[in-house]
Amino acid sequence: MTTSTLQKAIDLVTKATEEDKAKNYEEALRLYQHAVEYFLHAIKYEAHSDKAKESIRAKCVQYLDRAEKLKDYLRSKEKHGKKPVKENQSEGKGSDSDSEGDNPEKKKLQEQLMGAVVMEKPNIRWNDVAGLEGAKEALKEAVILPIKFPHLFTGKRTPWRGILLFGPPGTGKSYLAKAVATEANNSTFFSVSSSDLMSKWLGESEKLVKNLFELARQHKPSIIFIDEVDSLCGSRNENESEAARRIKTEFLVQMQGVGNNNDGTLVLGATNIPWVLDSAIRRRFEKRIYIPLPEEAARAQMFRLHLGSTPHNLTDANIHELARKTEGYSGADISIIVRDSLMQPVRKVQSATHFKKVCGPSRTNPSMMIDDLLTPCSPGDPGAMEMTWMDVPGDKLLEPVVCMSDMLRSLATTRPTVNADDLLKVKKFSEDFGQES
């Protein structure tokens, strides 16, 4: 296997240099990048002596350097008729053309990242988030107060610059971030995921990370929200790719590196699996807030929020009974229960074999009461007419209101999504590194 992997790398490099000489630069770039991947694999798993590793590493640097020059040339070729960079061209000789192409590249990367800026506010207020008072207070401390009362945060009293929200799935971490985007109306809110920062071009991903932070500093006060931060900043290990390692290193440098002033910039991360985060990244998140499963009072509030203005006849006692029965359910689970129960009246209409006339508000003029609306009923009801929903005129249907039996039926068919084992892992992480919300 040693011979085949190393030989494959050598064959690829040979083809790359041939394509390079033939001025097929796109193909040459692709082959150089593939060759480097094979060489790195050989260094990691197959080269046993330090001398062999050093020799392969030196070759990698040489081919990467050529790949970078080809990549710069291919990018700039569309904009200017730029001549190819000679293999033996020195840094000094290429400085003029490099400086010409550098700004457009930076501008292009920043334009790409501008898509991550949340231009429209989500319109979710603190009151729309049930419970999580500790998390809300920490976010107000970090985001709202420094903007409203900047004189409070002078000298050694500085706002938090890195906050990690962690907890089981569906507990409201991303929802809290939306509330921050709404409430921090003077801040620029960047919402990024791994897809915004990953690139097929070698070396471009870390440039995107760097430009993201530069863009945030230019538009401060700003918030960078990274959902599922574990996908970008997992623990460093032997098996990860060079690109992943470089992205992680750039994150570390930008979040708290020498020469980077992040005043007015908050990095807000969210994850369901905090135990896989790299320890250095974990340290950069100064405040680590555990977002637990909702307590009974918060669950009751969630039922009310999700029911909203939909017609229903549930009493406070019914709501509290539902809250008691949903121990171990996340906010997302409760949302699904309510959404399913709101569909129960529609299912009653679909399955009904009899309808009866009732009095209710007109569809065209809700202030006017009319007495010829039709609603589903049992065959034994007085005035029951045998018909299906297909026979009911579109403006004459009065759907049943949501009732407790609808909620219980939906609850019986919806199981909690949070696994007991995962919950134990999150609680263990919270005991070791977190703060309760």
UniProtKB/Swiss-Prot annotation:
Q: Which residues bind ATP?
A: 167-174
Entry EC number(s): 3.6.4.6
Give the subcellular location.
Answer: Late endosome membrane; Midbody; Cytoplasm, Cytoskeleton, Spindle
List every stretch annotated Disordered: 75-106
Could you tell me what this protein is called? Vacuolar protein sorting-associated protein 4A
Q: What is the lineage of its organism?
A: Eukaryota, Metazoa, Chordata, Craniata, Vertebrata
Disease / disorder:
CIMDAG syndrome: An autosomal dominant syndrome characterized by global developmental delay, severely impaired intellectual development, poor or absent speech, microcephaly, growth retardation, poor motor skills with inability to walk, hypotonia and spasticity, and cataracts. Cerebral and cerebellar atrophy, thin corpus callosum, and delayed myelination are apparent on brain imaging. Affected individuals show hematologic abnormalities mostly consistent with congenital dyserythropoietic anemia.
Name the consequence of residue 64 to A/D.
Abolishes interaction with CHMP1B; diminishes interaction with IST1
Positions carrying Phosphoserine are: 95, 97
The residues covered by the MIT domain are 2-80
Q: Does the keyword Signal apply?
A: no
Where is this protein chiefly located?
Answer: membrane
Impact noted for substituting residue 337 to V:
Found in a patient with non-specific intellectual disability; uncertain significance
Q: What is the effect of changing residue 13 to D?
A: Abolishes interaction with CHMP6, no effect on interaction with CHMP1A
Q: Which reaction does it catalyse?
A: ATP + H2O = ADP + phosphate + H(+)
Q: How does it assemble?
A: Proposed to be monomeric or homodimeric in nucleotide-free form and to oligomerize upon binding to ATP to form two stacked hexameric or heptameric rings with a central pore through which ESCRT-III substrates are translocated in an ATP-dependent manner. Interacts with CHMP1A, CHMP1B, CHMP2A, CHMP2B, CHMP3, CHMP4A, CHMP4B, CHMP4C and CHMP6. Interacts with VPS4B; the interaction suggests a heteromeric assembly with VPS4B. Interacts with SPAST. Interacts with IST1. Interacts with ZFYVE19/ANCHR; leading to retain it at midbody.
State what changing residue 68 to D does.
Answer: Diminishes interaction with CHMP1B
GO MF, one annotated term: protein-containing complex binding
Organism, scientific name: Homo sapiens (Human)
Q: What is known of its domains?
A: The MIT domain serves as an adapter for ESCRT-III proteins. It forms an asymmetric three-helix bundle that binds amphipathic MIM (MIT interacting motif) helices along the groove between MIT helices 2 and 3 present in a subset of ESCRT-III proteins thus establishing the canonical MIM-MIT interaction. In an extended conformation along the groove between helices 1 and 3, also binds to a type-2 MIT interacting motif (MIM2).
